[in-house]
């Protein structure tokens, strides 16, 4: 299985492309075991620049790195449908590649690219359960500046509560360009004056921080900052007529030829680029021909040229004879200068020699211990992100491909869900109702119900199940007349169809009460022989993890024995869906801090579970805050086996459970899937009457996975 790392920018000018390329180089050289074709997957969350990392990879490293180029979060709003669509695409890529690649490297969203970059970076990384590397810069290495930088990063990390943090890379240390006080021309002047190759190296010990690890401190290096002729003109994307051998020459100075053209006479640079407006061509020719040491001028940009004209042919001949490269564009001088302000001095995408030099320089600051796969230390606390959970729901249900009965077939949400499930092969949905009426409702609401979706007309099949219903309800004072009356309820009929093995599961409740769904299931399907009771759980899809709440829908005031059964059922359900259960038996007190019949009930239930299922990680009685917070757990329950990381919460009664799940769901505005019923011989699941189409789809998937 691949390792997934996400690079998250904390500042604007951090050399993200340089860091990404260098991490790829480091992993391929030092940590990738199988040097197979495209053993690394890379993608950026934005596609804003022709100088992007993916552009360099596709040009020079496509044999070892596979890229994904169609994902761009910079143009969508956080939590919008477009955002959810892109996030699902990212998760698809992750799952499609996690067994094919050794490393998945994701480049996060820069702060200046998107207004919601912080929220998106957090959400993407947590839903992928990625290891996170933050990238920051340091304008200077003074103790005061470093201290302030550490405070800012600490504050940021406390706010966002990232999981799986590998550490921080400080890049561009002491770069003269971080303050953004220079325009492009002045930057060239600064580079010309700086002679030393690197700035002072900042030792890691100076940046020692208890809140985050320091992976590398990379000083700015003058020797890898270039402004070659070819890079400038590829960046400007303008035409040329005489590139000659000077394409790799370094440009040290830019001169704008205007009414103050005498500045051309006074310069002593040997590598000069001159920008000339076509309207001043004649004057420029005279100056160049008569007064200037021509070796100074390496190339010329002619601006404002709409098309090649005969009257500049002499200019071309003159310049070509003197080995001066000529470039021309329709843009005016101001537009060209404005475009040059965005030129990236730190990466040259056209020169593989330069790129490899940069990769070696930066990767020298990395070490093996900095990239230790820290999850191995914390296997017990692996978080299951909600998007990954939902993706797995669909994946598992697609593999099972079960027949799921939906009796509320005239409800628009049900029909929309069935259409999506059919298109996505999540399940074979079977509707119960008048086919003509169902198709009429679907057509009126723009729902495309494919012809392969099975629709059973209840009028035509009720008589078939009458005898079986009377047999099941024998001894309950039900005669044929009352049985026929009950079978007019489509939920009762659908439950009989399930009991007869004609379908694999049943989903109902979008327009009916919970009791309308559960009562027929208890009367007809009945409990599993291994179960004493039927209980329910909700899957609570929090922003960065999935929690299970039980029982929030069925058992009003369970005994200690019943509470133990509910907890064991919930733990087994968690495992069914890939969640390693850590169970909190909730109460209003933790450990021995409180007394009362409710506390004693929870204590007894916990003891029963430990005796029956020693394989389960469980603690109780325990308060909710001690169950979810490591800090609180250290104070209230220092020896707790769940250590503030519970993911299965068993409430002592229906009153507390139902209130809690609705409070969390509504206050946090999260998706909750359920209630999923446990303990029945066949899967029957209830929908909330306020269920969305998405909720219904996930409940159908849950039901399919529960089916044997």
Swiss-Prot record:
Gene (name only): pta
Keyword Cytoplasm part of the UniProt annotation: yes
The protein's annotated pathway: Metabolic intermediate biosynthesis; acetyl-CoA biosynthesis; acetyl-CoA from acetate: step 2/2
Role, per record: Involved in acetate metabolism.
Organism, scientific name: Buchnera aphidicola subsp. Acyrthosiphon pisum (strain APS) (Acyrthosiphon pisum symbiotic bacterium)
Pfam families the UniProt entry points to: AAA_26, DRTGG, PTA_PTB
Family of this protein: In the N-terminal section; belongs to the CobB/CobQ family.
Record's keyword terms, sorted: Acyltransferase, Cytoplasm, Transferase
Oligomer status and interactors: Homohexamer.
EC number: 2.3.1.8
Major enzyme class: transferase
Catalysis: reaction(s): acetyl-CoA + phosphate = acetyl phosphate + CoA
UniProt xrefs under InterPro entries: DRTGG (IPR010766), P-Actrans_bac (IPR016475), P_AcTrfase (IPR004614), P_AcTrfase_dom1 (IPR042113), P_AcTrfase_dom2 (IPR042112), Phos_Acetyltrans/Butyryltrans (IPR050500), PTA_PTB (IPR002505), Ser_kin/Pase_Hpr-like_N_sf (IPR028979)
Domain of life of the organism encoding this protein: Bacteria
UniProt-recorded name of the protein: Phosphate acetyltransferase
Region span, Phosphate acetyltransferase: 388-708
Single GO MF annotation: phosphate acetyltransferase activity
UniProt GO BP: acetyl-CoA biosynthetic process
Location(s) in or outside the cell: Cytoplasm
Domain statement: The N-terminal region seems to be important for proper quaternary structure. The C-terminal region contains the substrate-binding site.
Gene3D superfamilies according to UniProt: 3.40.50.10950, HprK N-terminal domain-like, Isocitrate/Isopropylmalate dehydrogenase-like
Cellular component terms (Gene Ontology): cytoplasm
